[in-house]
């Protein structure tokens, strides 16, 4: 909210979003339960990214190249001028709604696994598949992988990963098994 309070660019972005939800209110006031819904989180995150990009550009910092992972692809396309602000926000609102519909009725979980080799995590995942769908969903960087799928299988895979030497297993606040074969 401090960007909104202090920079006209932020006011322009948030005040001109035309969506079926009040993005500004959700970002600044919540409630967290509503903001955490994928259909709401995604347009809010892209709106903040649009503001950040515009502020950087206003201060002479423009990207030579852009890239994004998952939701970040839309922010990258906006930063590159491929998608205008409203189109990017509309697309991710639709994307979030579609993801929620696809995940409805699936008891799912995602957990970040820290400090374990990919091959060892693959072993844990394969063993846990006896309980349901689980897979490595994100390769964030060496030593930081995310598993996702059906809750029971993901929990088991994380327990096995810890037994195999993972330093930590961090449950993620997600509303679906993103980047898995379930979604």
Residue spans of the language-model regions?
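Gly/Ser-rich oxyanion-binding loop with an adjacent helix/lid
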Residues: 42-112
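Alpha/beta catalytic cores of group-transfer enzymes, especially the acyltransferase/condensing modules
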Residues: 19-24, 30, 80-183
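Helix-rich "cap/lid" substructures immediately adjacent to catalytic or cofactor-binding pockets
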Residues: 1-67, 147
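Compositionally biased, intrinsically disordered low-complexity regions enriched in proline and serine
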Residues: 5-8, 75, 140
């Amino acid at each position: 909210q401090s960007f909104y309070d202090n920079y006209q660019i932020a006011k322009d972005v948030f005040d001109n979003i035309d969506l079926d939800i009040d993005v500004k209110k959700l970002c600044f006031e919540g409630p967290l339960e509503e903001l955490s819904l994928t259909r709401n989180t995604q347009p809010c995150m892209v709106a903040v990214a649009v503001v950040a990009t515009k502020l950087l550009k206003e201060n002479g910092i423009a990207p030579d190249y852009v890239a994004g992972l998952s939701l970040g692809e839309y922010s990258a396309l906006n930063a590159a001028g491929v998608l205008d602000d409203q189109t990017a926000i509309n697309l991710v609102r639709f994307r979030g709604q579609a993801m929620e519909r696809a995940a409805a009725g699936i008891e799912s979980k995602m957990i970040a696994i820290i400090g374990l080799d990919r091959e060892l995590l693959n072993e844990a995942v394969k063993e846990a598949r006896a309980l349901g769908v689980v897979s490595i969903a994100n390769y964030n960087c060496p030593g930081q992988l995310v598993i996702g799928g059906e809750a029971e299988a993901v929990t088991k895979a994380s327990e096995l990963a810890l037994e195999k030497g993972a330093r930590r297993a961090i449950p993620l606040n997600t509303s679906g098994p993103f980047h898995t074969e379930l979604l």
